[in-house]
C-alpha cells in the first residue's frame, strides 16, 4: 500500500501548482496503439506492473472494450513523472479512435490542453487520424506526435535505417500538413512537430520502448542499437535503454502547455462570456481563488456512488458541499463527493483546484457538456460533434413490468452520451434509440443486457432520413385555427457554404447571442446582409429569419413561433423525418391584440402548417445519410471488395497501394451498409480491415425516393401514399 499512498500524497501536493500540471490526451486512428501506449505510460509511472502493461489495457476497463479490443469510453488517470529533477502531475484522458464513438473524442478534447497523436508507422496517417487531429486543433489543443509500431518496420518489413527515415519523414510531413490546414491561425507555424526539438518520438508501445532526438543526445543511445536489439529479440535491454514512458512523458512535459499558459488562449475561444468579468479573468488566469467553474466532459455510472461527473476545472476550487448552478439545464445542485481518477479507481479528495480534472457526485441530471459554476454565467459553447445520429432501432421490453427500468436505463445512456438520441413513441409505446452507426448501437444495447439485466426486443436497424427543398417557395399564408392570426412565410434551400459553417460550429446553433455578428458572418458567406439581420434561430442545420417591419405584438409571440419552427423541422411534410438545410423567412404577420387569442394552440398550427405547405411548393426532396468506408485488403481481394460496394449503391473514391495492401476508400448509403461486416469478411476470407466515417447526406435518387417515403410512412402508421401539395396545403 505504501507506494499507492505516496502517489496520492504526491498528486495532492502537485494539484495546487498549475505550472507543474499537464492535461493531455492520446488520440489516434483505431488500432494504431493508443490504449497500449496509455497503459505503458501508467506502468512507467508505477500505476500497474510492467509485465502486464500492454496486455492488460488498464484504460479499457469496460468488459466490452476488452472483448472488442477497442476503446469505447474516454477514461482518465492522474500520474506523476519526474523531468529534469522536478515532479509533474500528468492527467491522461484516453479517447476512442473508432468513428462510432466520435462524440467521446470531442468531449475529451474540451478537458485537455495537449494531445499525443499516435500514428502507426506501417499504415501512416489514416482518415480517422485526420478527424481526431482536426477536433483537437478546433478546440485549441496542442499536438505532439508519437510514431508507433516501429518494431514492425524492422522485423516484418525489414527496412534499412534509410528507408525508415523516409517513412518517418512522410508521416511527419503528413501530420504537419494537417496542422497547417486545421490549426488556429496564430498557431499554424508554432505548433508544427519537429524531430529536432523532440516534439516527435518514435517507438513501439507494445514492446515498451521509444526514442526521441533529445533523448538520444542525452543518453548516447543510437537508432542502430535499437535495430540490433530488436533483431536479437533482447526486449528487456531495449526497454531499459530506451524506456517508453520516460521518452514520451519527457516530450509531454517539455512541449505540451500547462493550464496557466493554455487557458490564456483557450478560454476566449471556448467561452462566449465577457472575458473582462471576474469569472472571465479567473478562468484566463486559472485562479484557484476565483469563482468555481467547470465543464462536465463525461458522466459515468458507478455501482456505489451513482452518477459520477468528470470534468475540467477552469477557475476556483471544487469542494464538497458547494452549491452550484447547472447552466444549460437551469437547475441548482449540491456537490457531494470530490475526487480524481486513477484508472477505474476513484480517490476522494477534500478539494480540487483550477487546472485539474475532477470527478464529482451530486450533479443529478447533468449531461456531458454541461457548464457548472457557483455563479450564473454564460455557458461554454455547445460541443460540436463531427457526426450526427443516422441509425435508429426500436426497443421494447419483453416483460411489461421492466418498462420503468428500461425508461431509466435509456435516460441514463442518453445522459452519458449526448450523441445518442432517445425518443419515446407515445402511440406505439416503442422506444427509439438513434446512434452514429451499427457498432455504436450494438454497444449500448449490450449494456442494457449486462448492466441493467434487461431483456429487450430490438427491431432491425432503421435509417434516419432528412427532408429538404430544392427551390424557393412562393409566399404562403398560415392561419391560426381561430383565424385571428396570420403569418406569411417562404422557405428556400440553404446554400452549402452556410450549412457547412453551421456544421463546423463557425455559426453557433440556437438563438444567437450576438445577432449582428452572425448576420455579418452570413453576409460574408453570400447572404444579403439586410435579410441576414433578421436571424432569430438556427436549429439542426435550419434557419429562421424575421424579415418583417414593425409588426405589432410580434415580439410577444416570437418564442412560440420559434417553438413551432422547431416542430416543423423535427417532422417534415413528406414522411415526418427531420428537416435539414432549409431557411424559413417570415415576411409579414397579423396578430390578435388579446393574448388569449394568440396562445400556443393558435400559433403552433399556424406556423407549422405554413412551413410544411411552403416546403411542398419548394420542390421537396429526401436526403439519406452516407458512410465513407476505408478498407485495407490484400491485393487479390480488390475485385471482391469493389463488387461488394457496387452492389450497395456505393462508389469508389480512391485506391492506393501500400506494399502488399490495397487501401480502398468508398462511399455508400447507410441504408445499404447493414450486414456489410459479415459480407466483407466472407468475400475476403476475413482478411479485410475496415472502418467507417459519417460522410454527410446526399439526395435520394428520384426513382427510389417515392418507394422509401412509402416505407417510412407505413412504418410510422401513416397513410403510405406520398403526400401531394393539396394534401398538405389548407384549401383556401
Swiss-Prot record:
Any one GO MF annotation of this record: GTPase activity
Keyword Cytoplasm set for record: yes
The family this protein is said to belong to: Belongs to the TRAFAC class translation factor GTPase superfamily. Classic translation factor GTPase family. EF-G/EF-2 subfamily.
NCBIfam families assigned: aEF-2 (TIGR00490), small_GTP (TIGR00231)
Gene name of the encoded protein: fusA
Record's protein name: Elongation factor 2
Assigned keywords, A-Z: Cytoplasm, Elongation factor, GTP-binding, Nucleotide-binding, Protein biosynthesis
Localization: Cytoplasm
Diphthamide: residues bearing it: 597
Signal peptide: none
Primary role: Catalyzes the GTP-dependent ribosomal translocation step during translation elongation. During this step, the ribosome changes from the pre-translocational (PRE) to the post-translocational (POST) state as the newly formed A-site-bound peptidyl-tRNA and P-site-bound deacylated tRNA move to the P and E sites, respectively. Catalyzes the coordinated movement of the two tRNA molecules, the mRNA and conformational changes in the ribosome.
Native organism: Thermococcus kodakarensis (strain ATCC BAA-918 / JCM 12380 / KOD1) (Pyrococcus kodakaraensis (strain KOD1))
The tr-type G domain, residue ranges: 19-260
Primary location class: cytoplasm
GO cellular component term of the entry, any: cytosol
Record: residues binding GTP: 28-35, 94-98, 148-151
Record lineage: Archaea, Methanobacteriati, Methanobacteriota, Thermococci, Thermococcales
One GO term (biological process): translational elongation
Domain of life: Archaea
Amino acid at each position: 500500500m505504501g507506494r499507492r499512498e505516496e502517489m496520492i500524497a504526491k498528486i495532492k501536493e502537485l494539484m495546487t501548482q498549475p505550472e507543474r500540471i499537464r492535461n493531455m490526451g492520446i488520440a489516434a486512428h483505431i488500432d494504431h496503439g493508443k490504449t497500449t501506449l496509455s497503459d505503458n505510460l501508467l506502468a512507467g509511472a508505477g500505476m500497474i506492473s510492467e509485465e502486464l502493461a500492454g496486455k492488460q489495457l488498464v484504460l479499457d476497463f469496460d468488459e466490452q472494450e476488452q472483448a472488442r479490443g477497442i476503446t469505447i469510453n474516454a477514461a482518465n488517470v492522474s500520474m506523476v513523472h519526474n523531468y529534469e529533477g522536478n515532479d509533474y502531475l500528468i492527467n491522461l484522458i484516453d479517447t476512442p479512435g473508432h468513428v462510432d464513438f466520435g462524440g467521446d473524442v470531442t468531449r475529451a478534447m474540451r478537458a485537455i490542453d495537449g494531445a499525443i497523436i499516435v500514428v502507426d508507422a506501417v499504415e501512416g496517417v489514416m482518415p480517422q487520424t485526420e478527424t481526431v487531429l482536426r477536433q483537437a486543433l478546433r478546440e485549441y489543443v496542442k499536438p505532439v506526435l508519437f510514431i508507433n509500431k516501429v518494431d514492425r518496420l524492422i522485423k516484418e518489413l525489414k527496412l534499412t535505417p534509410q528507408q525508415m527515415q523516409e517513412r518517418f519523414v512522410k508521416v511527419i510531413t503528413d501530420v504537419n500538413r494537417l496542422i497547417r490546414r486545421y490549426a488556429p491561425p496564430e498557431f499554424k507555424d508554432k505548433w508544427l512537430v519537429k524531430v529536432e526539438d523532440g516534439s516527435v518520438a518514435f517507438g513501439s508501445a507494445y514492446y515498451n520502448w521509444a526514442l526521441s532526438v533529445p533523448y538520444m543526445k542525452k543518453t548516447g543511445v543510437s537508432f542502430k542499437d535499437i535495430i540490433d536489439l530488436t533483431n536479437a529479440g533482447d526486449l528487456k535491454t531495449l526497454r531499459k535503454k530506451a524506456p517508453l514512458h520516460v521518452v514520451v512523458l519527457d516530450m509531454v512535459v517539455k512541449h505540451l502547455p500547462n493550464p496557466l499558459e493554455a487557458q490564456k488562449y483557450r478560454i476566449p475561444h471556448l467561452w462566449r462570456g465577457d472575458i473582462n468579468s471576474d469569472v472571465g479573468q479567473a478562468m484566463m488566469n486559472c485562479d484557484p481563488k476565483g469563482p468555481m467553474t467547470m465543464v462536465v466532459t463525461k458522466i459515468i455510472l458507478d455501482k456505489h456512488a451513482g452518477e459520477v461527473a468528470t470534468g475540467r476545472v477552469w477557475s476556483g476550487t471544487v469542494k464538497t458541499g458547494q452549491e452550484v448552478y447547472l447552466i444549460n439545464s437551469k437547475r441548482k445542485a449540491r456537490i457531494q463527493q470530490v475526487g480524481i481518477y486513477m484508472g477505474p479507481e476513484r480517490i476522494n479528495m477534500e478539494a480540487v483546484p483550477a487546472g485539474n480534472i475532477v470527478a464529482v457526485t451530486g450533479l443529478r441530471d447533468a449531461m456531458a457538456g454541461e457548464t457548472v459554476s457557483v455563479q450564473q454565467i454564460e455557458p461554454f459553447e455547445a460541443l460540436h460533434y463531427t457526426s450526427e445520429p443516422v441509425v435508429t432501432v426500436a426497443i421494447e421490453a419483453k416483460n411489461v413490468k421492466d418498462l420503468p427500468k428500461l425508461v431509466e436505463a435509456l435516460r441514463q445512456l442518453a445522459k452519458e452520451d449526448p450523441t445518442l438520441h432517445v425518443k419515446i413513441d407515445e402511440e406505439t409505446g416503442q422506444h427509439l434509440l438513434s446512434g452514429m452507426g451499427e457498432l455504436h448501437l450494438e454497444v449500448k444495447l449490450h449494456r442494457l443486457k449486462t448492466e441493467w439485466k434487461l431483456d429487450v426486443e430490438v427491431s432491425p436497424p432503421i435509417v434516419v432520413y432528412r427532408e429538404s427543398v430544392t427551390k424557393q417557395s412562393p409566399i404562403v399564408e398560415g392561419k391560426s385555427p381561430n383565424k385571428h392570426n396570420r403569418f406569411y412565410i417562404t422557405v428556400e434551400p440553404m446554400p452549402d457554404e452556410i450549412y457547412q459553417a453551421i456544421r463546423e460550429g463557425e455559426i453557433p446553433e440556437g438563438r444567437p447571442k450576438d445577432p449582428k455578428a452572425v448576420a455579418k458572418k452570413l453576409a460574408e458567406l453570400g447572404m444579403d446582409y439586410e435579410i441576414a439581420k433578421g436571424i432569430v434561430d438556427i436549429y439542426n442545420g435550419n434557419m429562421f429569419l424575421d424579415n418583417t417591419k414593425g409588426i405589432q405584438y410580434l415580439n410577444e409571440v416570437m418564442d412560440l413561433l420559434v417553438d413551432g419552427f422547431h416542430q416543423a423541422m423535427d417532422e417534415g411534410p413528406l414522411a415526418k423525418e427531420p428537416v435539414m438545410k432549409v431557411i424559413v423567412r417570415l415576411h409579414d404577420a397579423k396578430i390578435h391584440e388579446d393574448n388569449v387569442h394568440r396562445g400556443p394552440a393558435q400559433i403552433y398550427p399556424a406556423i407549422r402548417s405554413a412551413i410544411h405547405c411552403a416546403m411542398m411548393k419548394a420542390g421537396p426532396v429526401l436526403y439519406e445519410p452516407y458512410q465513407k468506408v476505408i478498407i485495407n485488403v490484400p491485393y487479390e481481394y480488390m475485385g471482391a471488395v469493389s463488387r461488394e460496394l457496387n452492389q450497395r449503391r456505393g462508389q469508389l473514391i480512391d485506391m492506393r497501394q501500400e506494399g502488399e495492401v490495397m487501401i480502398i476508400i468508398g462511399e455508400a448509403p447507410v441504408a445499404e451498409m447493414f450486414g456489410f461486416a459479415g459480407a466483407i469478411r466472407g468475400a475476403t476470407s476475413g482478411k479485410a480491415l475496415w472502418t467507417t466515417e459519417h460522410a454527410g447526406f446526399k439526395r435520394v435518387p428520384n426513382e427510389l425516393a417515392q418507394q422509401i417515403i412509402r416505407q417510412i410512412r407505413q412504418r410510422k402508421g401513416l397513410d403510405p401514399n406520398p403526400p401531394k401539395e393539396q394534401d398538405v396545403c389548407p384549401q383556401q
